[in-house]
Amino acid sequence: MELPFAEAWKIKMVEPIRKSTRQEREQWLKEAHYNVFQLKSEQVYIDLITDSGTGAMSDRQWAGMMLGDESYAGATSFFKLKEVITRLTGFEYIIPTHQGRAAENVLFSYLVHEGDIVPGNSHFDTTKGHIEGRRALALDCTIDEAKQTQLEIPFKGNVDPKKLEKALQEHSERIPFVIVTITNNTAGGQPVSMQNLREVRAIADKYGKPVLFDSARFAENAYFIKMREEGYRNKSIKEITREMFDLADGMTMSAKKDGIVNMGGFIATRRKDWYEGAKGFCVQFEGY
């Protein structure tokens, strides 16, 4: 039997949390009018709303904040960030933002216009908001099995190729790009298979459409591929990650998820036209 190793880190800092009584919780819920979003964070023992920005950062990350170059232009911190992103993803053009929804705002300000249709797999709420706020339509093309909560299949986050093809057949001139969320957050954080990503790429290429990944949990998706998809057991997460991103034209990223930082995000792409078109909106919304 193969035994698991201990975690590869030491914990240097702890934050105390308080375990409440049932009577207290009942009172707090009553005071919040039974709207859990009105509870105070200190009243919640285990918060299951999101993991976003809640991961513990390493000593090197905290030290990096003290050593970071905050120059308005030409900051060395940017070039370090760019080198890492390009090494991991293969994307050449990088636009940093303060979080994932900001990356969507910057990129969609260039790509999405009134009357457009953006097909994908269960758009995340901010993604849908940025699309529909521009009087466009976020078209859900997720497989039907994703809604069957008792069904267990390896990749319930997949795009339905038939739904995607139908959308492109009927509305090709109104579709600026196809978006794939990895993992599929809105559908329970379910993963997307490499085979499905290949199918999406092939369909998009058939109609001359670019593919964008919402990549907040790309490393988790790569892990699921390694564990569940045939032919990937002996590949590293980095190898699987590069193979995934080779099937996309660009990505938006909330680094507060698989980047395991408390704040941050970015746009990365291999398309110079996306970069040139979006960077002006970055100055407008996010800074130089």
Give a label for each model feature.
Residues 2-55, 61, 70-94, 98-288:
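Conserved PLP-enzyme active-site core in the AAT-like
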Residues 67:
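Short glycine/proline- and acidic residue-enriched helix-loop micro-motifs
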